[in-house]
UniProtKB/Swiss-Prot annotation:
Protein topology in the membrane: Peripheral membrane protein
Record has 4Fe-4S as a keyword: no
Superkingdom assignment: Eukaryota
Residues that span the membrane, as ranges: none
Entry protein name: Penta-EF hand domain-containing protein 1
Record-listed Ca(2+) 2 binding positions: 81, 83, 85, 87, 92
Binding site for Ca(2+) 1: 46, 48, 50, 52, 57
Positions that bind Ca(2+) 3: 111, 113, 115, 117, 122
Localisation per UniProt entry: Cytoplasm; Membrane
Gene Ontology molecular function: calcium ion binding; calcium-dependent protein binding; identical protein binding
A Gene Ontology biological process term: response to bacterium
Gene expressing this chain: pefA
Description of the deletion phenotype: Cells lacking pefA and mutants lacking both pefA and pefB grow normally in axenic medium or on bacterial lawns, and have no major differentiation defect.
UniProt entry keywords in alphabetical sequence: Calcium, Cytoplasm, Membrane, Metal-binding, Repeat
């Protein structure tokens, strides 16, 4: 008997090196059906069928407020690009997509007055529930850098801020192989981190 129904492409488990990364936990939170939907979107945007996408392709992803845009897409690629090729494969993309979903949910949950923006206190809470436990003083400095007048951050600004924090985390963890929270960095490593964040 023939079946004419839609067949989902099987999703293979990610490679072991991917499973050792801090953002693998985002991948593990994705439901099976969501994973197939993400796979379909990924394949539709991967025009050259290379199995990876660039910031130019990723910028078209719509998240709550509209497309990511090239600047945010570039930052997010830097976070999730394990092999530093300037592109992400499907597993990296799926973790990135879930990262954005979690940030968006936490943004909405902390925008208690529904103004469409969040202040430093709300950002601190949203970051904590998103897995970034930073001291409030650091969050306040980041907030004032992103919003010099202190009006609050829209989701697009919050996502860019989180991407910058995640880049710093990824770069730091490259030097903290034992995951102790301590790394030996020289001044050139610091310059690298500053230039990429």
């Amino acid at each position: 008997m023939m079946s004419y129904g839609y067949q989902q492409t099987p999703i293979v488990a990610p490679p072991a090196k991917f499973q050792a990364l801090w953002f693998y936990s985002f991948y593990t939170q994705i439901q099976h059906q969501q994973l197939h939907e993400m796979s379909a979107w990924f394949r539709s945007i991967d025009k050259d069928r290379s199995g990876s996408i660039s910031a130019m392709e990723l910028q078209h992803l719509h998240v709550g407020y509209g497309p990511l845009g090239i600047e945010t897409a570039t930052k997010l690629i830097r976070v999730f690009d394990v092999d530093k090729s300037g592109q992400i494969d499907f597993y990296e993309y799926a973790a990135l997509h879930q990262f954005i979903n979690i940030l968006y949910a936490n943004f909405l949950a902390n925008d208690r007055n529904r103004s469409g923006t969040i202040d430093a206190q709300e950002i601190h809470r949203a970051l904590g529930t998103s897995g970034f436990n930073l001291p409030f003083n650091t969050v306040n400095l980041l907030f004032l850098k992103a919003s010099p007048r202190g009006y609050g951050l829209k989701f697009s600004d919050f996502l860019g801020l989180c991407a910058s924090i995640a880049i710093a985390r990824s770069l730091f963890e490259a030097h903290d192989r034992m995951r102790t929270g301590v790394a030996h960095l020289n001044v050139n490593h610091i310059y690298d981190i500053i230039s990429l964040v």
